[in-house]
């Protein structure tokens, strides 16, 4: 590996089909010329017999810690970290401790707030832990429409103006950069996201490609943002 090669660390789950999670992160990093390291947090396999619900197996927190420790020790410097699915308060706790220990300069949080098939009570505990323990360490957060609504405390987000307000509210919680993703859900014929950094509110809009919702699209975008930041791009340019 050349001395100029940038390193990105994905702290995320393994998704067996390869369409999301750490597999997608590593593939996206490589496509953009960034070397990817991983710390797997859980193993997810879709259940084709029960409406594709998530069969979710968490990885022992000590093993997660050991993976992060190894990645940092081997590479010496991590240019950017992308955090995906964590899944349990225990996992969130060990990842938060690692963020406090290593003080990574660039942390992109793709806040997976719900796992299909997860019990509502467990999901709420996980969401609250993510908000209190990991969100304060993020330099950039990339919530989808549902996650933007939850993190901002808004009842609904159905317009660009409401999405902008959601981004403002998340920024006000201490996150320097927010990329709130509506994608194609506003039925504008475009993929539409909003970027906010406390002063600049930018609506990012391009023609939509296809009409079906695709698993892993959010992972791919967040991983691409992470890779571009690792390469030295500004958060807005990366978005």
Model region roles, listed by residue range:
Residues 124-201, 236:
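Conserved phosphate/ATP/ADP-binding segment of small-molecule kinases
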Residues 2-10, 22, 26-118:
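Conserved N-terminal subdomain of the carbohydrate kinase-like
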Residues 10-23, 223:
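N-terminal beta1-alpha1 ligand-phosphate binding loop
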Residues 51-58, 119-125, 153-158, 210:
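Short glycine-enriched, charge-decorated loop/helix-capping segments at active-site entrances
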Residues 42-44, 87, 113-115, 147, ...:
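Glycine-rich beta-alpha junction loops
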Residues 21, 144, 218:
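Short, conserved phosphate/pyrophosphate- and ester-handling motifs at nucleotide-, phospho-/glycolipid
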Residues 149-150, 212-235, 239:
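Short, small-residue alpha-helix embedded
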Residues 11-17, 202-216:
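Short pre-catalytic strand/loop immediately N-terminal to key active-site residues, enriched for Gly-Thr
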């Amino acid at each position: 590996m050349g001395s100029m090669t940038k390193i990105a660390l994905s702290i995320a789950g393994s998704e067996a089909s390869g369409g999301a999670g750490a597999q997608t992160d590593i593939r996206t990093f490589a496509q953009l010329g960034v070397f990817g390291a991983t710390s797997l947090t859980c193993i997810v396999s879709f259940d084709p017999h029960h409406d594709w619900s998530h069969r979710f197996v968490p990885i022992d927190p000590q093993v997660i810690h050991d993976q992060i420790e190894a990645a940092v020790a081997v590479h010496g410097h991590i240019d950017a970290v992308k955090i995906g699915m964590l899944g349990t308060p225990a996992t969130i706790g060990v990842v938060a401790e690692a963020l406090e220990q290593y003080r990574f300069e660039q942390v992109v949080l793709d806040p997976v707030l719900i796992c299909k098939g997860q019990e509502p009570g467990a999901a709420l505990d996980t969401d609250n832990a993510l908000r209190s323990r990991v969100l304060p360490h993020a330099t950039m957060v990339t919530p989808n429409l549902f996650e933007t609504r939850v993190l901002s405390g808004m009842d609904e987000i159905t317009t660009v103006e409401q999405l902008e307000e959601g981004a403002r509210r998340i920024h006000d919680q201490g996150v320097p950069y927010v990329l709130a993703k509506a994608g194609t859900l506003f039925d504008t014929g475009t993929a539409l996201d909003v970027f906010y950094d406390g002063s600049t509110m930018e609506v990012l809009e391009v023609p939509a490609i296809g009409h079906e919702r695709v698993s892993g699209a959010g992972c791919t975008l967040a991983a691409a943002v992470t890779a571009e930041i690792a390469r030295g791009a500004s958060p807005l340019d990366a978005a």
